[in-house]
Design a protein with these regions (language model features):
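Beta1-alpha1 glycine-rich phosphate/pyrophosphate-binding loop at the start
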Residues: 2-74
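Residue-level detector of beta-strand face positions
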Residues: 89-91
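Structured loop/turn residues at beta-strand edges in well-structured enzyme cores
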Residues: 3, 78, 98
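A conserved short coil-to-beta-strand element within the FAD-binding core of flavoproteins
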Residues: 77-87
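Conserved hydrophobic beta-strands of the Rossmann-like cofactor-binding core
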Residues: 9, 103-104
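Core beta-strand elements of the Rossmann-like FAD/NAD(P) dinucleotide-binding domain
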Residues: 93-102
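Conserved small/polar residues in nucleotide/adenosyl-binding loops
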Residues: 108-110
Length: 110
Protein backbone atom coordinates (compact mmCIF):
# COMPACT_ATOMS: atom_id res chain seq x y z
CA UNK A 1 0.00 0.00 0.00
CA UNK A 2 1.28 3.45 -0.84
CA UNK A 3 1.52 5.50 2.38
CA UNK A 4 1.93 8.72 0.39
CA UNK A 5 -1.18 8.29 -1.76
CA UNK A 6 -4.68 9.50 -1.08
CA UNK A 7 -6.37 7.37 1.57
CA UNK A 8 -9.53 5.84 0.12
CA UNK A 9 -11.87 3.82 2.30
CA UNK A 10 -14.49 1.60 0.70
CA UNK A 11 -17.11 0.51 3.22
CA UNK A 12 -19.07 -2.60 2.30
CA UNK A 13 -18.53 -6.27 1.70
CA UNK A 14 -20.62 -6.89 -1.38
CA UNK A 15 -19.92 -7.04 -5.10
CA UNK A 16 -20.11 -3.26 -5.62
CA UNK A 17 -17.52 -2.61 -2.90
CA UNK A 18 -15.18 -5.23 -4.34
CA UNK A 19 -15.62 -3.81 -7.84
CA UNK A 20 -14.79 -0.33 -6.48
CA UNK A 21 -11.55 -1.63 -4.93
CA UNK A 22 -10.55 -3.40 -8.15
CA UNK A 23 -11.42 -0.44 -10.38
CA UNK A 24 -9.66 2.12 -8.19
CA UNK A 25 -6.48 0.11 -8.10
CA UNK A 26 -6.57 -0.33 -11.87
CA UNK A 27 -7.32 3.33 -12.58
CA UNK A 28 -5.29 5.07 -9.86
CA UNK A 29 -2.46 2.58 -9.38
CA UNK A 30 -0.24 3.36 -6.42
CA UNK A 31 -1.50 6.95 -6.18
CA UNK A 32 -4.05 5.72 -3.64
CA UNK A 33 -3.96 3.57 -0.55
CA UNK A 34 -7.07 1.42 -0.36
CA UNK A 35 -8.90 0.10 2.69
CA UNK A 36 -11.88 -2.21 2.39
CA UNK A 37 -14.05 -2.18 5.51
CA UNK A 38 -16.31 -5.24 5.46
CA UNK A 39 -18.42 -6.92 8.15
CA UNK A 40 -17.50 -10.42 6.92
CA UNK A 41 -14.38 -12.21 5.70
CA UNK A 42 -16.03 -13.44 2.51
CA UNK A 43 -17.79 -12.01 -0.50
CA UNK A 44 -20.93 -14.09 -1.00
CA UNK A 45 -22.43 -14.10 -4.48
CA UNK A 46 -25.85 -15.66 -4.92
CA UNK A 47 -27.38 -16.70 -8.22
CA UNK A 48 -30.01 -14.34 -9.52
CA UNK A 49 -33.56 -15.53 -9.00
CA UNK A 50 -34.16 -15.77 -12.73
CA UNK A 51 -31.36 -18.32 -12.91
CA UNK A 52 -32.28 -20.16 -9.74
CA UNK A 53 -35.83 -19.42 -8.60
CA UNK A 54 -36.82 -19.56 -4.95
CA UNK A 55 -33.20 -19.22 -3.77
CA UNK A 56 -32.33 -22.75 -4.84
CA UNK A 57 -29.14 -21.57 -6.52
CA UNK A 58 -25.69 -22.03 -5.17
CA UNK A 59 -23.75 -19.44 -3.27
CA UNK A 60 -20.20 -18.71 -4.27
CA UNK A 61 -17.80 -17.61 -1.54
CA UNK A 62 -14.66 -15.58 -2.24
CA UNK A 63 -12.16 -14.67 0.51
CA UNK A 64 -11.94 -10.90 0.79
CA UNK A 65 -8.42 -11.13 2.25
CA UNK A 66 -7.17 -12.68 -0.98
CA UNK A 67 -9.00 -10.17 -3.16
CA UNK A 68 -7.56 -7.29 -1.11
CA UNK A 69 -4.05 -8.77 -1.13
CA UNK A 70 -4.16 -9.19 -4.90
CA UNK A 71 -4.56 -5.42 -5.35
CA UNK A 72 -2.46 -4.29 -2.37
CA UNK A 73 -5.45 -3.11 -0.33
CA UNK A 74 -5.96 -3.44 3.40
CA UNK A 75 -8.94 -5.50 4.56
CA UNK A 76 -10.49 -4.52 7.88
CA UNK A 77 -13.16 -6.95 9.06
CA UNK A 78 -15.44 -4.81 11.18
CA UNK A 79 -18.75 -2.97 10.98
CA UNK A 80 -19.02 0.68 10.03
CA UNK A 81 -20.57 2.42 13.03
CA UNK A 82 -20.37 6.06 12.01
CA UNK A 83 -19.09 8.70 9.64
CA UNK A 84 -17.88 12.19 10.55
CA UNK A 85 -17.75 13.87 7.15
CA UNK A 86 -16.41 17.16 8.54
CA UNK A 87 -13.44 15.44 10.22
CA UNK A 88 -13.13 12.92 7.36
CA UNK A 89 -13.12 9.98 9.76
CA UNK A 90 -15.10 6.81 10.18
CA UNK A 91 -15.76 4.93 13.38
CA UNK A 92 -15.75 1.15 13.33
CA UNK A 93 -17.88 -1.15 15.46
CA UNK A 94 -14.79 -1.79 17.59
CA UNK A 95 -14.59 1.94 18.35
CA UNK A 96 -11.48 2.48 16.24
CA UNK A 97 -11.42 5.67 14.18
CA UNK A 98 -9.79 5.91 10.75
CA UNK A 99 -9.17 8.93 8.58
CA UNK A 100 -9.77 9.15 4.86
CA UNK A 101 -9.34 11.46 1.91
CA UNK A 102 -12.20 9.83 -0.02
CA UNK A 103 -14.97 7.55 1.22
CA UNK A 104 -17.14 5.20 -0.83
CA UNK A 105 -20.20 3.80 0.93
CA UNK A 106 -21.38 0.58 -0.66
CA UNK A 107 -23.63 -0.75 2.05
CA UNK A 108 -26.18 -3.46 1.54
CA UNK A 109 -28.08 -3.02 4.79
CA UNK A 110 -28.81 0.30 6.45
Amino acid sequence: MSPSGARVIIAGGGPAAVEAVLALRELAGDRVSLELIAPNRELVVRAYEVLAPFHEGHEHHYPLAQIAADVDAELVVDALAGVDADAQTITLGSGERRGYDALILSLIHI
